[in-house]
Amino acid sequence: MTAIYLVRHGEADYELIGKRRWPGKLADLAPLTARGVEQAAVAGEELADVGAVKLLSSPFTRTMQTAGAVSCRVNLAIEVELDLHEWLPDDTFRWHNLTEVRALVADFDSCGGEWPAGERRVWEPLSSVRRRSAAVLRRAAASVTGGGSIIAVCHEMVIRSVTGEVKTRHGEVRRIESSQLP
């Protein structure tokens, strides 16, 4: 059994993206706010003594920046894992602003995170997020021999998919055991 520490990235500066009028997936280039940088540093402090042997990160700017702060405290290289990426609110990548994303989130929530029977939505079902995220974490846990834990810097929806916890604060750390993975 391997301990896995799931870290939600620090607060991102989406205002910066909005000012540039960058649509859709370009929002994933948003860096952390000053507060987000602090949250990342606090997470790094919290994880300094957990005996981590692997540090995984989603490829997005906000997670990579958070993982960088954690890396400085745990002295591990960051391993980028594509399948720890954020939930896809629109798999056509055609959304233009946060108002559209909020509407998609509301639809996701009203459907309990899964497409209604016989229907298809543009958003990624929670079961898909769970499948890809849990596979990454299981592989990482299986590669740990002789003890040690794993840190995975990711997103609220990824954490929700593997823990069932709906809300996770920016910079929050949640611990699970590899045996608890879905």
Predicted regions and their residues:
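Short, active-site-adjacent cap segments at secondary-structure transitions
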Residues: D13, T63-M64, E86-L88, V158-R160
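Generic structural signal for well-ordered alpha-helical scaffold segments
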Residues: A41-A48, R130, A134-A142
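Short, well-ordered beta-to-alpha junction loops that form the rim of enzyme active sites
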Residues: S57-T61, D83, V153-M157
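Active-site-proximal alpha-helix that buttresses catalytic centers in soluble enzyme cores
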Residues: T2-V80
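Phosphate-handling substructures
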Residues: L26-P31, C72-R132
